Curated annotation (Swiss-Prot):
Forms part of the ribosomal stalk, playing a central role in the interaction of the ribosome with GTP-bound translation factors. Belongs to the universal ribosomal protein uL10 family. GO terms for biological process: cytoplasmic translation; ribosomal large subunit assembly. PANTHER family: 60S ACIDIC RIBOSOMAL PROTEIN P0, LARGE RIBOSOMAL SUBUNIT PROTEIN UL10. GO terms for cellular component: cytosolic large ribosomal subunit. It comes from Haloarcula marismortui (strain ATCC 43049 / DSM 3752 / JCM 8966 / VKM B-1809). NCBIfam families: PRK04019.1-4, PRK04019.1-5. Pfam families: Ribosomal_L10, RL10P_insert. This is Large ribosomal subunit protein uL10. Residues 302-341 have a biased composition (Acidic residues). Has been called L10e and L10E in this organism; in this case 'e/E' is for E.coli-like, not eukaryotic-type protein.
Length: 348
């Protein structure tokens, strides 16, 4: 019998079974369930985090063995989370997707002091400027930890940004004291997501850390390309149909003008074209007595204004030009998120 089977069949105290049942109920009530690291978070701050999460997520802290048993009882692939239950951890459940959960947890982190013996999560820098500390022994403490410090203008000044500890190095008691004196909080305290399970898929933090601006830009560009493909391939969708109808209307109007097809929408333009041609012809006749009264005195330069075929095309295709403008706008990467999402989603 495997260790897992033994763990499932062994008898445990009633209070433990009740705790496991409560954890199982919590797990089954959410779409996404993850494991978070809570090491180093003071209990009061942990309670504040629980309160802040209320309404969007639930944090459950218990013995690791009971968390593992509950995940095994639920099954459905959730037992894969057992590999992340080490040290001080808790389970977090939410109906949000894993990406939203990760972003929420990252945004909720707050700066905190770093103590002696802790490992620097990033380079620790004492910034250039006035420390606000009066001249005294503190200048020597700054210099001893690697800061470029001097006494100037009646106070202790740091003359340039000074990196006093590199990422991954251990913080000394002396450096911890200096940082606390300066009010520098080089670490962030919060719930670190180790893994989250949703819709049968296990996600790790590296897969959830997205550049939102870049992602939005990619979606907008894809939406623009999809819009143009739909228009140019004559493949109508709910989003592109209005533009395609405008283009078709412009083409039909241009054809009607060139072929002199009598249509209620085209007749005014046909009359204008014929009038211009008559006036152009009249301007070439020297004997005004041969002309109707309304055409007498027509200036010769009017002939130069006779519409050409190209000009007819331009006049007839105003709606077509509007359609082209609409298509070009769809290719602009600066389209708002809603238009981009609608265009891409409605493509096929």
């Amino acid at each position: 019998m495997s260790a897992e089977s033994e763990r499932k069949t062994e008898t445990i105290p009633e209070w433990k079974q009740e705790e496991v049942d409560a954890i199982v109920e919590m797990i089954e009530s959410y779409e996404s369930v993850g494991v978070v690291n809570i090491a180093g978070i003071p209990s009061r701050q942990l309670q504040d985090m629980r309160r802040d999460l209320h309404g969007t997520a639930e944090l459950r802290v218990s013995r690791n063995t009971l968390l593992e048993r509950a995940l095994d009882d639920v099954d459905d692939g959730l037992e894969d989370l057992n590999g992340y239950i080490t040290g001080q951890v808790g389970l977090i459940g939410t109906d949000d997707n894993p990406f939203s959960l990760f972003q929420e947890l990252e945004a909720s982190k707050t700066p905190a002091p770093i103590g002696a013996g802790e490992v620097a999560p990033n380079d620790i820098v004492i910034p250039e400027g006035d420390t606000g500390v009066d001249p005294g022994p503190f200048v020597g403490e700054l210099q001893s930890v690697g800061a470029d410090a001097r006494i100037q203008e009646g106070s202790i000044q740091v003359l340039s940004d000074s990196t006093v500890l590199d990422t991954g190095e251990e913080v000394s008691q002396e450096l911890s004291n200096v940082l606390n004196e300066l009010g520098i909080e080089p670490k962030e305290v919060g719930l670190d997501l180790r893994a989250v399970f949703a819709d049968g898929v296990l996600f790790e933090p590296e897969e959830l850390e997205l550049d939102i601006d870049e992602y939005r830009s990619d979606i907008q560009a894809a939406a623009g390309r999809a819009f143009n493909l739909s228009v140019n391939a004559d493949y109508p969708t709910a989003t592109t149909a209005p533009t395609m109808l405008q283009s078709a209307r412009g083409n039909a109007k241009s054809l009607a003008l060139q072929a002199a097809i009598e249509d209620p929408e085209v007749v005014p333009d046909l009359v204008s074209k014929a009038d211009a041609q008559v006036r152009a012809l009249a301007s070439q006749i020297d004997d005004e007595e041969a002309l109707p009264e309304e055409l007498q005195g027509v200036e010769a330069d009017v002939a130069t204004e006779e519409p050409t075929d190209d000009q007819d095309d331009d006049t007839a295709s105003e709606d077509d030009a509007d359609a082209d403008d609409a298509a070009e706008e769809a290719d602009d990467d600066d389209d708002d998120d809603e238009d981009a999402g609608d265009a891409l989603g409605a493509m096929f």
